[in-house]
Amino acid sequence: MKHSAVEPEPESASTLCGEALSALRSFAADVALYGEELGLVGPRELDRLWTRHILNSALLARLIGAGTLADVGSGAGFPGLVVAIMRPDVSCTLIEPLGRRATWLEDESKRLGLGNVTVLNQRAEDTVGQAQYDYVTARAVSALKTLIPLVVPLVRPGGELVLMKGQRVDQEIRDAASVLVRNGLQDPRVQITGPEYGTEETRVFRARVAEKA
């Protein structure tokens, strides 16, 4: 099977990823080898695998503290597996409804020797009541007004949403104004990161879930 060309590792990867770079190289090689065949990534995504996917996910790992994180719709492992590689002090639960992708996440976490990964082959809404997390993230899942009611039940009181968004995030926040209030979200804001590490800009929507009275 012919594989698409893979983006060379950018110089900024060393600065951003530090000691995790070796494991991320192994992960990138596996995505390049199996990604198209398993339907994890499209052929046009491999020529920006590092910049758009791996480094983009690595930026999130720099924004959170130790604790627990759930990645909703983890897919090929962006950002969940990348966070797990970079942050052994974060216990990562990868929630993925598609069986072949969940199997990939299980197999890849074992190949990489990650002891801080749990994979749930379920829809996010079906996991409600099983656990709550310090952080919940999602990437390229849906607009905030749809996504927030889905993921807030997974966040512990006082925990935080850290949702990876695109350039339309400000409009999404305006569209979701009533949803933010209804779901008890505090201090909603957009954090822009990336240029300080010499890589592309990434926008992260952050909001804290209110403590119970």
Regions found by a protein language model. Give the residues of each.
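Class I SAM-dependent transferase core
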Residues: 1-70, 86, 100-117
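A short acidic, Gly/Pro-enriched loop at the edge of an enzyme's catalytic core
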Residues: 125-135
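Conserved beta-strand/loop positions that form the S-adenosyl-L-methionine
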Residues: 72-74
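Active-site capping/gating segments
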Residues: 89, 93, 168-213
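Conserved SAM/SAH-binding loop
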Residues: 121-126, 141-142
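Helix-to-beta-strand junctions that scaffold the AdoMet/dcAdoMet cofactor pocket
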Residues: 87, 155-157
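Conserved SAM-binding loop of SAM-dependent methyltransferases across substrates and taxa
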Residues: 76-89
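Conserved beta-strand signature within the Rossmann-like core of class I S-adenosyl-L-methionine
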Residues: 158-171
